[in-house]
Structures are given as C-alpha cells and as structure tokens.
C-alpha cells in the first residue's frame, strides 16, 4: 500500500516487482513475497496502477521512483478509481494473481504450476466506492 498524509492507495504492476529498500545494509525487495521468491524486475522505466480516485501526491511519486531506481519522469502512474469501469476491470483482472498468492500462502510449490487461467465477473461501475 501507498500512503502519505491522508492519501492511501493500493498499487499493482511492474513497479511492485522493481521496488527495493536497504535493510541492515543489504538491498532487498520492498515486498516480502518477492524476497521469498528471490525475484526482482529491472528496467529503466516502470508502471504502477493505483486504486484511488485521486492523483497521488508528489511525495509518493518520488518515493516509488526512488525505490524502483528510476527517475519520476520514467514512472507512469495510472489512477483507476474502484468506482470506474477501468477500476473494476483492474481489480478482477488480477484473479489469477490472487490465486497464486493463495497457493504460495498454503506453501504449495509454485514451481509445480506451469499454466493458469481465471475468470471473474466485471461489476458495473457504481459512484459509491464501497458498493463498487
């Protein structure tokens, strides 16, 4: 999650797999999952999709860019309110990701998964964030 002051949002996309931090003098992924999987993306540009109805403050943009090792100009942020069609598609589009997280949490050997597919209904947009 991303937060600064009163701003809070969830993020997804390649930036999550690129973001690192220094802990006890060592560089490691920000997300524990990527640390456990010993996985990290590396590129000179990246993208982050944010579930929120407001553009993030510059402090979040700078923090994400720094964690990914890119300049803020090379970070594309897509803002998708959950109450919008794009936000709804973005949420249900991660159904397979959620299944993989569950398999990992249950200690299923992920190397045994060679293919996957998922489906979920796309709810119609609703102006109320909670109902969406």
UniProtKB/Swiss-Prot annotation:
Compartment(s) of residence: Cytoplasm
EC number(s) reported in the record: 3.5.4.27
Domain of life: Bacteria
Primary location group: cytoplasm
GO BP term, example: formaldehyde catabolic process
Coiled coil segments of this chain: none
GO terms of molecular function: methenyltetrahydromethanopterin cyclohydrolase activity
Catalysed reaction, written as an equation: 5,10-methenyl-5,6,7,8-tetrahydromethanopterin + H2O = N(5)-formyl-5,6,7,8-tetrahydromethanopterin + H(+)
Record keywords, A-Z: Cytoplasm, Hydrolase, One-carbon metabolism
Any single Gene Ontology cellular-component annotation: cytoplasm
Pathway: One-carbon metabolism; formaldehyde degradation; formate from formaldehyde (H(4)MPT route): step 3/5
InterPro entries per UniProt: Cro/C1-type_HTH (IPR001387), METHMP_CycHdrlase (IPR003209)
Similarity section: Belongs to the MCH family.
Protein role: Catalyzes the hydrolysis of methenyl-H(4)MPT(+) to 5-formyl-H(4)MPT.
Protein name in UniProt: Methenyltetrahydromethanopterin cyclohydrolase
Species: Methylomonas rubra
Gene assigned in the entry: mch
């Amino acid at each position: 999650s991303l937060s600064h002051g009163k701003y809070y949002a969830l993020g997804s996309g390649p930036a999550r797999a690129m973001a690192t931090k220094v802990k006890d003098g060592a560089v490691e992924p920000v997300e524990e999952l990527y640390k456990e999987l010993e996985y990290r993306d590396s590129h000179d540009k990246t993208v982050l999709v944010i579930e929120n109805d407001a553009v993030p403050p510059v402090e979040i943009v700078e923090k994400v860019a720094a964690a990914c090792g890119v300049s803020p100009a090379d970070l594309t942020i897509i803002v998708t309110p959950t109450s919008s069609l794009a936000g709804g598609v973005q949420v249900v589009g991660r159904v397979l990701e959620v299944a993989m997280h569950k398999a990992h949490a249950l200690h299923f050997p992920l190397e045994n998964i060679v293919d996957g597919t998922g489906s979920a209904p796309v709810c119609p947009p609703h102006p109320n964030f909670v109902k969406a």
